[in-house]
Amino acid sequence: MIPQGYEPLDLDYLRDFAARVYLPILDHYFRPRLVGAEKIPAEGPLILAANHSGNAFPHDAVVLDATLWRHDGLVAERKFRTAYEKELTLVWWMRPFGLDNFWRRGGGVDMCFDNFDRQLARGDRVLYFPEGVPGIGKGFNRRYRLQRFSTSFVTLAARRQVPVIPVYVINAEWVHPFGYCLGPLNRLMQRVFTVPFLPLPVGLLAVVFPWMWYLSFPAQMTFVVGDPIDVPAMVREEGVTDAAVRDGERMGRVAERIRLRMQARLDEEVRIWGRRPWDLRSLVRELWKVRRRFLAILPIGWPVTFTRQERDRSRPPARGRLHALLRDWDLVGFYLPFGWPLLSLTRALRRPPYGYRGLSRAEAREIRGDFVWRLAERPLPPRPAAAEEAAGTEIVPAAPPPPPAWRVRAPARP
């Protein structure tokens, strides 16, 4: 049993991961742009509501989370807590390259109504995707078409009197361009493999070559922060006077009004920022800057880059290049045809930090994080003092990006 005050967020790991692995990928591969960050309050509680997209692994959520935190200087108290679907933790292949408890160590909390409520009551800034899985798995043919919004964030925003700040995610639809989903196949994947959907055709390639399950094309994502939405006022307009009572019908109408409002603004921002989703000239220029570590930046090198950073934190330095290569021999499974069984087998037979041999089933389960986390049973500790800052970081907030040179004239804003 995990004691009260369970906090899986690992800031030391995240800062090391950012410096050694992810910030170089952000800068030279994804090259994200953050517009309007000054509209986000420095303290919570608040809900940052973003559209979901990509028809792939949730790269849009990871890039947005990392971009926001870097903008805030990697300060502990400014780290958003992401509400994510529990399926991301229950099976190892839904964590990036099987990294133990990755989503929770990165600040995520299992998505359910009670957890969401407790996070806002705690004063957290919560990153939330109101479309859920249908948003990310809608297929390229429905790109930028917002799916039905959940009513949870409407109810809780009214109950806790917190602002909802929209974020419009542009170009993440091009993480897997021309990808599609089939309903019957998705239901089969959910039932057999606990995978919410299988994107086609890349998903079929990922069945053969495991590293392609985590593939992302170099979409230059742009995150545009919109003006706060006064959800409590919208709820009152629907005649709801007691937000403690869950009124699904009226809250659903408010959620639909918010969806339509965000859809109109999203369409506008796509016209401004979405004309060059990859911007290949910028990509080539950035990759040339890191040509000596080219493979570490590209998706084909991510299995090695991500996994070695994790393992190096709990093992002595390699005795040489050959030793460094041989001790991670199991990573070849990501590149072998049908390498999934080899990866699963080595996780069972190798000792930590490579696998779980020698650990009890309960110990391995806690390390992996493949359980449903309910804050009612395992609560977060109180938030630290807002004045405490992260020590030792040299990262400074990024300047707002200039508009693209080819920017079209923006329509008048209401």
Question: Model features per residue range: what roles?
Answer:
Residues 1-14, 118-397, 404-414:
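Non-catalytic C-terminal accessory region of glycerolipid acyltransferases
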Residues 23-53:
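Helix-to-loop junction immediately C-terminal to a conserved catalytic motif
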Residues 31-33, 111-114, 151:
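Short alpha-helical segments and helix-capping/turn motifs at coil-helix boundaries
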Residues 12-23:
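Negatively charged sequence features
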Residues 42-116, 121-122, 132-147:
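Catalytic core of membrane glycerolipid acyltransferases/transacylases, capturing the structured
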Residues 32, 46, 80-81, 126, ...:
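A broad, low-specificity signal marking well-ordered, structured residues that form hydrophobic/aromatic
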Residues 40, 53, 88, 169, ...:
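Hydrophobic pocket-lining residues within nucleotide cofactor-binding pockets
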Residues 22-27, 72-74, 100-103, 215-216:
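Short, conserved catalytic or adaptor-binding loops enriched in Gly and charged residues
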